[in-house]
């Protein structure tokens, strides 16, 4: 499903499970900055409160780079808020509202979360 399926959860706290597929720096020159959201984490096979979604991107500070690299290719579970954001539609250059997540809980493996 697409991220528009997250619309009913707008501004609400949800449980997110997914597999960390890729971790990278948004800007490699800012890798020593502590406050910028510079780490991009790609989650695949995501389930947000029972709704299946293909993929989601998490934007985190640099301290999460090492943690996410340890958890790469593992299923993780955490709580998050669904937040709306605007992006540019490449076909006609209009702003389109889409939905993403902002992490509120810690990134832990799904097995550790259940225990």
Residue ranges of predicted features:
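Transition segments tied to proteolytic processing and entry into folded domains
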Residues: 1-7
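Structural detector for short beta-strands of small beta-barrel domains
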Residues: 8-47
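Short nucleic-acid-contacting surface segments enriched for D/E, G, S/T with interspersed K/R
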Residues: 11, 60-79
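Generic detection of short hydrophobic beta-strand segments and adjacent strand-loop junctions
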Residues: 14, 18, 56-63
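OB-fold and OB-like beta-barrel modules that bind single-stranded nucleic acids
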Residues: 16-20, 76-83
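OB-fold/S1-family single-stranded nucleic acid-binding modules
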Residues: 44-46, 81-115
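Short, basic/aromatic beta-hairpin or loop at an interaction surface
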Residues: 47-57
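Polybasic, proline/glycine-rich intrinsically disordered low-complexity segments
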Residues: 51-53, 73-75, 112-115
């Amino acid at each position: 499903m697409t991220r528009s399926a997250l619309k009913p959860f707008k501004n609400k706290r949800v449980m997110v499970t997914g597999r960390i597929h890729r971790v990278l720096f948004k800007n490699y020159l800012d890798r020593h900055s502590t406050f910028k959201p510079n780490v991009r984490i790609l989650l695949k096979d995501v389930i947000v409160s029972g709704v299946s979604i293909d993929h989601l991107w998490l934007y985190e500070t640099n301290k999460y780079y090492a943690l996410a690299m340890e958890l790469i290719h593992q299923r993780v579970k955490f709580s998050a808020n669904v937040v709306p954001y605007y992006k540019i539609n490449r076909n006609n250059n209009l702003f389109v509202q889409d939905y993403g997540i902002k992490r509120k809980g810690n990134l832990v493996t799904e097995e550790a979360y259940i225990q």
